[in-house]
Amino acid sequence: MRFCLLVAFILPGLFLVHAAPTSSTELPEASGEAPETSPLVQNDEQPHQRLTFYNWDYKDLGTTAFEDISFPARQPPAFVNQTEKCPDGWLRFADSCYWIEKELLGFAKAERNCFEKQSTLFVANSIEEWDAIRVQAKEAFFSWIGLVRFTHYEKLEQLPRWQTEGALNPTKINWLIKPYKPLFNGWSSLANCAASYKSPSSLESASYTYFYPCTYMLYSICERNSTIVNALQ
């Protein structure tokens, strides 16, 4: 009963609380320095079998858990020059640039929006990256990240899939209920998509990750990783 009351209390804040985003980590906006090229993290804790460079893409979003939107055939993203700056308004961490989306979107539209920006939804390759970027999200709201546990994979995999390879083991991030169990963290046949909540409180445990229905209108975080984008050429 205590758990249910907690969720019921949090959900209204999803749409009723309005606050300007603040940051506890100083990340420079487009600094003029090129994102450095580095090999993808090879993590022995990778939770699922490596399938392709993408662990999932827009073609996987055509199930009943996602909103019904059209996905035109996609071409490989345009070449990103290694001497290029992060675009205006983007944040930099290591070899990636990040966009904090201020429009409320369903998960599938958020993924398409990131693709149109030559990026993916945010995929954390380390706990340092996770902690640095999630605090940049809009305060007192949830933001979509590139982490999904698809209904059609549930019998094969307990852990959710990051959108791209080489990512942090998802059990390491700040789930609401630990140790990580999908059902205890909101997962269901319709709630396949993970979102990160940025609490206005300075208390670290007040911010967390939770599964929500993929049709919910949330903010989102895009990541343009120079290694990933250029490897897809």
Swiss-Prot record:
GO biological process, one term: immune response
Boundaries of every C-type lectin domain copy: 93-223
GO molecular function, one term: carbohydrate binding
SMART domains the UniProt entry points to: CLECT (SM00034)
Family annotation (Pfam families): Lectin_C
Gene3D superfamilies: Mannose-Binding Protein A, subunit A (3.10.100.10)
UniProt entry tagged with the keyword Endoplasmic reticulum: no
Residues bearing carbohydrate: S31, N81, N225
UniProt entry tagged with the keyword Glycosyltransferase: no
Record key words, sorted: Disulfide bond, Glycoprotein, Lectin, Proteoglycan, Signal
Protein name: C-type lectin domain-containing protein 87
Lineage of the organism: Eukaryota, Metazoa, Ecdysozoa, Nematoda, Chromadorea
